[in-house]
Regions:
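Extreme N-terminal, non-catalytic leader segments
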Residues: 1-5
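Glycine-rich phosphate-binding P-loop
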Residues: 6-27
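Short beta-strand-centered segment that lines the nucleotide-binding/catalytic pocket of NTP-utilizing
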Residues: 29-45
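Loop/turn-to-beta-strand initiation segments
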Residues: 30, 103-109, 129-131
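Conserved nucleotide-binding/hydrolysis micro-motifs of P-loop NTPases
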Residues: 37-40, 113-116, 136-143
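Conserved nucleotide-sensing/catalytic segment adjacent to the nucleotide-binding pocket
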Residues: 44-105
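Conserved mixed alpha/beta catalytic, RNA-binding, or beta-rich assembly cores of soluble enzyme
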Residues: 48, 96-97, 111, 116-132, ...
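A glycine- and Lys/Arg-enriched "phosphate-lid" helix/loop adjacent to the NTP-binding pocket
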Residues: 126-167
Length: 167
């Protein structure tokens, strides 16, 4: 039987960690990893002078882009920064998936770095049961969850300032 690879993506504060944990527990999947942990490893290997976007948060990575005048809108700029940030993490995510497939182990991976179109899941389709979920919620509910989460983890002040970019 092929292993399951379940990818759960969303903006911060939507509830992907909670859902990922429930999915892993319900399906008896012993491996659950957050892309933030993978990012931390990649940051340790690639310095900020070579990858400044990687060393920012996904929601403010756009502040490191050099050619900001080439973007038609602020939304395009924010998206480009986010994709630049994620592009450093995705190869490592693909290596984690490869290892799980090789070992025939199922895994749930959750995080903001899972970007449809940037992560190449086609390479695993014959080897694993791949399921990719992108979670969304309406803006008012997201903002309420975002504030509650920021207060609970006591490190969300900056994230609240970047709610629009995070969304």
């Amino acid at each position: 039987m092929k292993p399951y690879v379940i990818l759960i993506s969303s903006a911060s504060g939507i509830g992907k960690s909670t859902i990922a944990s429930e999915v892993a527990n319900t399906l008896g999947i012993k491996y659950l990893i957050e892309t933030d942990f993978i990012r931390a490893i990649v940051r340790g290997i690639i310095g900020s002078e070579y990858a400044p976007a990687l060393h920012k948060s996904s929601y403010n990575a756009y502040t490191t882009l050099r050619d900001t005048y080439n973007f038609k809108s602020e939304e395009e700029l924010i998206t480009a920064g986010y994709e630049e940030h994620a592009s450093f993490v995705i190869p490592a995510i693909e290596k984690v998936i490869s290892r799980c497939v090789l070992d025939n182990d199922s895994i749930v991976i959750e995080g903001v770095h899972l970007v449809p179109g940037l992560i190449n899941i086609k390479q695993f389709e014959d080897l694993a049961n791949i399921h990719f979920f992108v979670l969304t919620v309406d803006e008012k509910q997201h903002q309420e969850r975002f504030i509650q989460r920021a207060l609970a983890i006591k490190r969300g002040g900056t994230q609240i300032d970047y709610f629009k970019e995070n969304r």
